[in-house]
Amino acid sequence: MRAPEFWHKDGFAARLLEPVGLVYAALTRHRVARPPGVRLGIPVVCVGNLTAGGAGKTPVALAVMDALRRRGVVGHFLSRGYGGKMEGPVAVDPVGHGPEDVGDEPLLLANSAPCWVSRNRASGGLVAEGAGAQAVVMDDGHQNPSLAKDLSLVVVDGGYGFGNGRYIPAGPLRESIEAGLARAGAVILIGSDSENLAARIPPHLKAGVPLLTARLEPGPEAARLVGRKVVAFAGIGRPEKFFATLTALGARVVARHPFADHYPYAEADIQPILDEAYGLGAVPVTTSKDAVRLPPDQRPQVDVVGVRVVFDEPLAFEALIDRLILGRLPS
């Protein structure tokens, strides 16, 4: 689904749904309050957020894995596999599996490191450890206590913040801001801070918990689009962020097509976009997360732009990995 407008700007619909949201929040509060879950013999870092929709979790998870790799640590990803039908635990095969099997994010992550899909996070973590993982990076799961975490990174979109401050479905919040931030080992604020979050977040953090600022930048492959006309489409949490990124790098976005997050593309969805791009003399462009959901025959006809997270203080991020992740590794 696409996030409704009232999730960001409060209105009558949000107030009408508030009672349902309070029930959702109570259920989450009850789940999070369960006793600590299974503790692995290896470090577990969770990359999560407090809201539904895209905040930049996947690029951060990839950055964590890259930091582990540079330290000689064998890391495995662990995902619930949202949108896929397989319950797992199962190792993601980028060639043999499709998004209908394991979801889109695991397919993207599996191109970087071994990735496991498991509805039961504890079972997935145990299988990863048994398969040789020296650390586990969880994609999402901040509100899931079944697997004990050594570090919880809470990712926040600086341009969206916490929306209207209400709970799903009245707003985007999965749980209360105070409770979610209290469990954070660090907060990563991504993008322009239009919500004054750098001042609003720290009072809710435990002493010594850092707030890191970062931005998303397109990969080097985006350079070929500078000055060219593009027809852009995306089915992510906030498609407009992708369109703005293309404009900022110098591409001429002549048409844009937003789809719902995790949208399962069919050939009938993509062909009109390809035809439009051809008619305009433009390049059809989408995100790397969308690319894994494209019909195989049409995938080669679409240009793909990935993004990476760039920290404003990279040494602070590196220190976080050293202190909170590698400290649990056997010497």
UniProtKB/Swiss-Prot annotation:
Transmembrane segments: none annotated. The keyword Lipid biosynthesis applies. GO terms for biological process: lipid A biosynthetic process; lipopolysaccharide core region biosynthetic process. Keywords: ATP-binding, Kinase, Lipid A biosynthesis, Lipid biosynthesis, Lipid metabolism, Nucleotide-binding, Transferase. The keyword Protease does not apply. HAMAP family: LpxK (MF_00409). This is Tetraacyldisaccharide 4'-kinase. The lineage of its organism: Bacteria, Pseudomonadati, Pseudomonadota, Alphaproteobacteria, Rhodospirillales.
